[in-house]
Amino acid sequence: MKFATKAIHAGVHPDPATGAIMTPIYQTSTYVQDGVGNHKGYEYSRTLNPTRHALEKNIAAIENGKHGACFGSGLAAIDCVIKMLNPGDEIISTNDLYGGSYRIFNTIFAKYGLVFPFVDMQNPA
């Protein structure tokens, strides 16, 4: 499948409830469950919803990967990746980054033994 075709169609399936060709944007926060802990794939939008699920499948297909992951913010994505590291690991970062990222690196994650050298990325030396 060519890139443009993947970008438009990967992860997209007609909505069984409405017949919509493209995945609807689901703005609900919670989903009906058949019983406690017995959901139909979605229980709370913060964990997963059909819109984000389709986007993650689409990104995985575009990147020729098995899985894709989407987050509500860049800091949420950073938090997820950083938590896979171990004390003593170093993350080389640009010195020209979002202030929230700088603060979370230095005030939260540095306490766990992670090292964050900040580099001037405009100076290749």
Where in this protein do the model-derived segments appear?
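PLP-dependent aminotransferase-class I/II
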Residues: 106-125
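Short active-site oxyanion
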Residues: 66-68, 89-90, 115-116
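Histidine- and aromatic-rich ligand-binding microenvironments
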Residues: 14-16, 23-24, 29-36, 120-122
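Short conserved active-site loop signatures built around small residues
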Residues: 1-25
